[in-house]
């Protein structure tokens, strides 16, 4: 296990501190800059481009964010770097560009977006670790996907590894327990599914738990009752109430 208690220290801005009212879109350099300036940790999503370069983007398809249909894995990082996100000046950034911008100012919680299917993610874990090599700053890696977490472990990841998960049924807890047998360091859980026996047991064993995705003060209060820290969007968690941004 890797020491990961720092993940509890501050709220985590979901896909950066984005704000549609000010045309700051998710997973963009503008959103990451805004989060760093506010002192929030940053959550981001990483996909693998056609040239095996990790890029920061949530969806498998480009249409919602870039206005064109197509699988992100069919575009090179250079091609993606020319695509406007939400019609703004921001383009789809590489993980390397994002790291250069944040430069250790705040912690990073990076979710790796795997794919189903044999061989779909071959080399993905190694590509992420290669980009991270030498980065001076706090980093944690997480995924919904067992095979991604296994590959990160097998590749000798020096970073805390976490399970992204949801669910409130025993069969789901069984799958989560199986993933935790990899020796994971933290959990990111869907907060409406708390409390539950799986998370209660993991916290009792010393595993830090953050939640996703909190959008108001009620969710914040629920998180701090049943978990350790939150991943948030759409409000300023420092405020007593939770007005829209």
Predicted regions and their residues:
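Phosphate-group recognition and catalysis centered on beta-loop-alpha active-site segments
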Residues: 1-245
């Amino acid at each position: 296990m890797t020491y990961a208690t720092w993940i509890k220290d501050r709220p985590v801005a979901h896909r950066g501190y984005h704000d549609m009212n000010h045309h700051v879109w998710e997973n963009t350099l503008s959103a990451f800059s805004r989060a760093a300036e506010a002192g929030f940790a940053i959550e981001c999503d990483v996909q693998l481009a056609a040239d095996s370069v990790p890029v920061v983007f949530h969806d498998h398809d480009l249409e919602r964010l870039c206005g064109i249909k197509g699988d992100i894995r069919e575009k090179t990082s250079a091609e993606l770097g020319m695509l406007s996100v939400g019609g703004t000046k921001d383009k789809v950034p590489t993980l390397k560009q994002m790291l250069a911008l944040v430069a250790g100012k705040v912690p990073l919680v990076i979710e790796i977006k795997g794919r189903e299917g044999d061989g779909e993610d071959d080399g993905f874990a190694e590509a992420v670790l290669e980009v991270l090599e030498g980065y001076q700053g706090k980093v944690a890696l997480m995924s919904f996907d067992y095979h991604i977490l296994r590959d990160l472990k097998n590749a000798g990841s020096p970073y805390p590894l976490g399970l992204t998960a949801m669910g409130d049924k025993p069969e789901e807890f069984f799958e989560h327990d199986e993933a935790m047998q990899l020796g994971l360091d933290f959990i990111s859980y869907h907060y409406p599914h708390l409390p539950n026996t799986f998370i209660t047991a993991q916290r009792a064993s010393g595993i830090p738990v953050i939640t996703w995705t909190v959008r108001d003060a009620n969710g914040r209060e629920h998180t701090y009752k049943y978990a350790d820290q939150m991943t948030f969007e759409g409000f300023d968690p420092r405020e007593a109430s939770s007005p829209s941004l």
